[in-house]
Amino acid sequence: MAMAYLRAGLSINPLNGKVPAVPDWTKFAHQLPTTDHVSVWWHEHPTANLGIVCGPASGVFVLDQDGEQGPQSLLLRELPPTVKTGSGRHYYFALPSDTQFKNAVGFLPGLDLRTTGGQVVVPPSRHASGAKYVWDILPEQLARALADIDIPYEGEIQPFAEAPDWLLEEIANLAK
């Protein structure tokens, strides 16, 4: 499964739960790991969860919604839900090439921003609660790479969404 994510152009890393299992994983925000890296990592961590390293290499950033407050922060916002997590959702967006986003815990109530130097857990990983991570909207590039693999998803196949203006404005306010 990890190789399929890599074939899709997504920078990946093995996770112990939600914690990266390799010490130098952050460098893969700017470069994709090699197939040799991935082979060694999963040989050393055969039961690891799978994570996407956010940033330029993968071309994505993620809003990580957890708990009760997250849905309230997004109540009147239009977002493409993409992954159901054990305790919320991940909303994936194409990373604009001209931006320097920073990770932010509590970006909005119940929402964390995961970007360059951040990572998120992806299907078919399991949450500590036992719940499986499931794609709601399977990214188009991943669907092509996974054509011969059965990956759980419940909705449609689309490219990563462009971030809406309101979200880019909120992110810009972080830098002020």
Which role fits each region the language model picked out?
Residues 1-176:
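Conserved phosphate/metal-binding and DNA-contacting active-site motifs used
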